[in-house]
Amino acid sequence: MAKKPTRGGVDRGVDPWPLGQRPGFLVRRLHQIHVALFQEKCAEFEITPLQYSLLSALAVRGTADQTTLAADVALDRTTTTGALKRLHARRFIERAVRRDDRRARACRLTAMGAALLSRMETAARAAHRDTLASLSKSDQKRFIALMQQIVAADGFRA
């Protein structure tokens, strides 16, 4: 039986569980690594990974309300709205009150936003590629599939 850690000679009553074996810790570290790579590769554009995701979602959807975009990028509406306001201030998106629902705002890419997204694409893809660079191509595909499986099964939690 593994010896239980003690502090000041007091038995803590738990077996050690190294951080490097904890899924939550590893996911957080991988996220930190990816954000650092994204910022390194995309620094010239002054866009965060979240803003890039929102621009990408709008490129696919054309027009979408803020609630839909929040769901697309798996964030709460408040955080999403703040990011959209910053993109709007830089003229990368348009936000307008919807005619059918005065409480909702419809968003769409501007020509500037579409051009930015196009210019960023190579650098952003390089950040994603470099995040998984230590894995073989087959392991990269397997890793993505495993992450998709976990998100599909438990995505409702957040």
Describe the predicted segments one by one:
Residues 1-45:
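N-terminal leader segment of winged-helix/HTH proteins
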Residues 3-6, 35, 63, 85-148:
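Charged, amphipathic alpha-helical coiled-coil/dimerization segments
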Residues 26, 33, 53-56, 115, ...:
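Pre-recognition alpha-helix immediately N-terminal to the DNA-recognition helix
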Residues 28-31, 56-60, 121, 148:
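Short, locally clustered residues in the helix-turn-helix/winged-helix DNA-binding domain
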Residues 57, 72, 90:
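Residues within the alpha-helical elements of helix-turn-helix
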